[in-house]
Amino acid sequence: MQIAFGSGLFYATPLMDAMGNAIATPTPILLGIMQECGVDLTFDTKELFGGDQFAVDAARGMGKLTGKAKAAQISVSQWNSLIFGQTLATGQVLVSHATTPQPIPEGLSIVITPPVGGTVTGDLGVRGAGGVPFVRVLSAPATGQYTYDAATHTYAFAAADEGVQVFIDYRYTVATGNSLSVKNLPMGDMPVFQGELYLKYKGKSTYVRVPNFVSNKLGIATKQDDYTIPDFEFTGYQDEFGEVAYWSANE
């Protein structure tokens, strides 16, 4: 008797980018820290009835092949290959979230300095005691207000707020990592990949390959006290030889 246990391994090999260009040297991708994976086959069933309660015949109609996976590893590079198929760039966006307050000085202005190698790209707000937000204005801030100069990364405050403790959050970029600007492409433009699911338990193996998958969902949900597990969904279709899926097992 053959059974399976565990989440298995899922390999995705990009075949085509969103512009329809074949990948010259496809690089297989192993979805990391797999939580669960599935391949589903469903069919429409048409029933023929006469005057009695039960069908006199039934026939299979259209079929549908779908897949889904939940994997904890976060990779913009992988997401681009499997979901977007667009142009990946170097660099990433980071956020400085203040957990220690600083007093508004006598000069009424604070210049923020990002970590070494970082470039400030935007204001993410100022908070006072109890998390009460200050209101950003264009000029002449009053009590509880501030201005932000994007050119000099300077926050300015009202004279009445001198000495008040504030938390300042901002956004900055660094040269490391990856980034992706997702464009609004015409309908029908999407990457294609081959999917392979492999399960091994007690010396016996189960293998499923789908030659063509297109993604139809990427979900990222956070939890207060748990890991973020991105989930994917995809739809399969036949290759040029009419093969929809390939299965193998010990039994």
Residue positions per predicted region:
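Mixed-charge, glycine-accented linear interaction segment located at domain edges/termini
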Residues: 129, 156-160, 205-251
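Extended beta-strand solenoid/passenger and fiber regions
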Residues: 76-145, 171-203
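Short, hydrophobic/aromatic-enriched beta-strand segments in well-ordered soluble domains
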Residues: 70-72, 164-173
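Solvent-exposed edge beta-strands and adjacent loop segments
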Residues: 1-82, 205-231
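Short, surface-exposed beta-strand/loop "edge" segments at domain boundaries and coil↔beta transitions
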Residues: 19-22, 77, 162-165, 176, ...
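Strand-loop-strand motifs at the edges of beta-sheets in extracellular beta-sandwich domains
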Residues: 145-160
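Extracellular interaction modules
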Residues: 62-66, 157-167
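Residue-level recognition of well-ordered beta-strand positions that form the cores
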Residues: 68-70, 169, 198, 233-235
